[in-house]
């Protein structure tokens, strides 16, 4: 059932994806409900830097575009798409009302500088970047290779970290965005990584179909196995998840 709901949610979102660029900012604002916007606004009004910790939901780009349309442009890092046309279209959509998106391969310094310059940081915490860059901490009923560096990024950019999650209502096509109060990330890499995962668990538990499970979030395992290849012998294909 979860697989069916996830595919249905993803398909509906992609059918509406182009509307984020084709329609006006007023159209988008009328179709978004934000809980906790006052939390973010209070930090900005107090001249405090902010990083939004945003798990990979299907609607992950919506809050960034929405906030920029409200005069709060964000700064993010992203991996270049393999298709140049797709990469150009996605970049144009993300920064259409302001903001910055840096190529991840260029390092973190431009991202940190933009936050210190007043942009709202947009940090994606949940992709598996391999065991050499991660710590293994609890995630739901398993253990997950999790990036440990958000606490250091917050310290270097002198920022408050606010968890945020975006979801799409599949009944009417509107978007729901929830922002939580800032949490502290100063207890060491493993505890900080676990704190991030707990925030993801909170968001995803009530709306699991909104999450991008297709990202192979559990590819790296402490025992070295690659569980995404378990069912490979059932199919006449040499497809394999990259290690």
Functional labels for PLM-detected ranges:
Residues 30-33, 83, 101-104, 143-144, ...:
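A conditional alpha-helix N-cap/helix-loop micro-motif detector
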Residues 2-5, 9, 92-96, 191, ...:
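A non-catalytic, amphipathic alpha-helix used as a structural packing/dimerization or gating element
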Residues 4-5, 25-30, 54-56, 73-76, ...:
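Short acidic/polar alpha-helix capping motifs at helix-coil junctions
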Residues 12, 46-105, 117, 132-135, ...:
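Catalytic core of membrane glycerolipid acyltransferases/transacylases, capturing the structured
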Residues 38, 58, 151:
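Active-site phosphate/pyrophosphate-handling residues
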Residues 41-45, 69, 73, 105-243:
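Non-catalytic C-terminal accessory region of glycerolipid acyltransferases
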